[in-house]
């Protein structure tokens, strides 16, 4: 179902949600961190979703073991490098990795700015080694409040040329976008793109707010847009992208089953929506699974899957010249 003549992208992929179970085990041993299991087989149920979680917050707790073993900046650098290696193994030509340095720093009180620098270094080395093109999106973890988000923002601004966009993720219901207006004003002043997790746990009003108040050019998940016809019209007319994550939305119980996922309707409505993974290490899936298993199960035709693949590059935070060069590079193969 993947068109090999087109670039394959993943533009909604959490770096800190893609820490390999084997790496968690190895870092736990290296830093003498107590883990819930001592073998890979017995650890996996603790760090990957085995059965669907009741809600988004429950799903997010699965990520915690991955960041609990980040006891040094070298560990952060390693997982960033491995994220690029995983992208290469998946056949991705371009990936946008998003990460929350405050979340990654929390367990061992690492310097937030140091985490940002370590991630930049690891991703840069990975791109050199594996030939994948990547850009970084900075996440503010709304769950930790406005002050913590300000600290993350300042760490990103210290490396503003290495950050492509700003995102807001975490507890959407408890911490609405209205709390973070000043943060996004600073992000736009820095010349960054804006993408916001919205319409996943909260309703369509969260998406409207992300667009109107925070300046979102893309929406992470955005499944609740299906409840507002005027919003769907607006998304299509303004070419505001929806970063769909099929399996993730089932695992968080945001959508009951793949057959009920709104991605097919979004595409039929002319919305620029694409297929992405979200937290592949925690989910136990990869981009190939999303295209070949999840998308057909969500009712997408072969042509709709191809359109979603095209949309992935169109939505990417790349210049027109960068997109053209990537298309030509893939076509030449």
Swiss-Prot record:
It comes from the Bacteria. Keywords: Hydrolase, Metal-binding, Nucleotide metabolism, Zinc. It catalyses: adenosine + H2O + H(+) = inosine + NH4(+); 2'-deoxyadenosine + H2O + H(+) = 2'-deoxyinosine + NH4(+). Its cofactor is Zn(2+). One of its GO terms (biological process) is purine ribonucleoside monophosphate biosynthetic process. Substrate binds at residues 14, 16, 170, 279. Pfam families: A_deaminase (PF00962). It is an enzyme of class 3 (hydrolase). One of its GO terms (cellular component) is cytosol. The record marks 221 as: Important for catalytic activity. NCBIfam families: aden_deam, PRK09358.1-1. PANTHER family: ADENOSINE DEAMINASE. This is Adenosine deaminase. It comes from Shigella boydii serotype 18 (strain CDC 3083-94 / BS512).
């Amino acid at each position: 179902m993947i068109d090999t003549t087109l670039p394959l992208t993943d533009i909604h992929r959490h770096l800190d949600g893609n820490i390999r179970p084997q790496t968690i085990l190895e870092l736990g041993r290296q830093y003498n961190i107590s883990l819930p299991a001592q073998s890979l087989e017995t650890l996996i149920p603790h760090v990957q979703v085995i059965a669907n979680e009741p809600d988004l917050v429950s799903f997010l707790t699965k990520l915690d073991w991955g960041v609990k073993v980040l006891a040094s900046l070298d560990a952060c650098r390693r997982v960033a490098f491995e994220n690029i290696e995983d992208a290469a193994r998946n056949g991705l030509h371009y990936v946008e990795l998003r990460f929350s340095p405050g979340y990654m720093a929390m367990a061992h009180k690492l310097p937030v700015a140091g985490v940002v620098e370590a991630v930049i270094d690891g991703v840069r080395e990975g791109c050199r080694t594996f030939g994948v093109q990547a850009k970084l999106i900075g996440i503010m973890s709304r769950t930790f409040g406005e002050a913590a988000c300000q600290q993350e923002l300042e760490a990103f601004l210290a490396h503003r040329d290495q950050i492509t966009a700003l995102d807001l993720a975490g507890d959407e219901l408890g911490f609405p976008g209205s709390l973070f207006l000043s943060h996004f004003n600073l992000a736009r002043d820095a010349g960054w793109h804006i993408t916001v997790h919205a319409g996943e746990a909260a309703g369509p009003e969260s998406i409207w707010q992300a667009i109107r108040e925070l300046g979102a050019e893309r929406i992470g998940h955005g499944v609740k847009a299906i409840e507002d016809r005027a919003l769907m019209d607006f998304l299509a007319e303004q070419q505001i992208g929806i970063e769909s994550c099929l399996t993730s939305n089932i695992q968080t119980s945001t959508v009951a089953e793949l057959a009920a996922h709104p991605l097919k309707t979004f595409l039929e409505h002319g919305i620029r929506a694409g297929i992405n993974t979200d937290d592949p290490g925690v989910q136990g899936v990869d981009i190939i699974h999303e295209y070949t298993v999840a998308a057909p199960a969500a009712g997408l035709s072969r042509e709709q899957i191809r359109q979603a693949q095209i949309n992935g590059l169109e939505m990417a935070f790349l210049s027109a010249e960068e997109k053209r060069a990537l298309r030509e590079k893939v076509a030449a193969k």
